[in-house]
Amino acid sequence: KKIEILNADNTYANANIHPDYWRLIGNVSFLHNNAVMTCDSAYHYTYENKMEAFGEIKINQGDSITLTGEKLTYFGLENKADITGDVVLIDKHMTLKTNQVLYNLSTNIASYPNQGEIIDNEKIINSKRGAYHSNIHSFIFKDSVVVINKDYNILTDNMRYNSSSEVTYFFGPSFIISDNKTIYCENGWYNTKTDIAQFRENTYISTESYLLKGDSLYYNKNKQYGKAFSNVQLIDTVENMTVYGGIAEYFEEEEKIIISKKPMLELLFEKDTLFMHAKQFVSQQKPGEKKILAYPKVTFFKTDFQGKCDSLSYNFTDSVVEMF
């Protein structure tokens, strides 16, 4: 389908000097595949079905996409636009700012090869490269991805995001950073609408007090609850304590972690290590107090002593052990 010129204040054509194009100047507008494009001036290459446009570039595709920039090369045979300058793409769901957009009007996919910024509701997303599929409101971000939100920031290598469902998918090393903790994973998803997430591959939660690791991690931000599965480790570097297990439940508001499924505790002293087994361990921290609880069927041993009981409480603050 040929590019249709809708308007130009002045049109220049000279078959002897430049037989392959027309020069269009002033309030230029043209139509192709239901997209209206406007600019200050343009070259219309009739045989190639191509336009080179300059000035205040604007592309309107129905009521879904508006794209502005300073220079446009439009390839009519391929239905592709290359827009450069201060480029802004706007639809109902987001705004993209960058210095170059490659836009396919057939597939409605826009990509940017250089640094871009997405503004979506209360989030700002930056990445070196990215693409946006407007039909399904889906983004792909690559290289140095940074998400800035009022409650948390995300740093990752590769990320997919759908602005309709508001679900984010992570690929590669990823950090979710908030005021009091950092969550790490190498694969997973986060629903920013419900604040529910599932993280996989070398996952951990890190706070000032401890590191909680596992093969996978379920997290509900609204309930301040997390659950780690398989190869679980609770590492308290301040107290030189590590608790191993199969499952760990994390209660953020209560500052409590419950570790179960064949758990074992290691407590390092200056010249020795205390080992302890029980059905489950509970690590709890309150203002001025930090405790580890073990129950039931507690057994423990160290080089110079060993013992067993039904339940045990150890207070790190005053080093008091209570057995029941």
Stretches with model-predicted labels:
Residues 1-324:
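N-terminal amphipathic/hydrophobic interface segments
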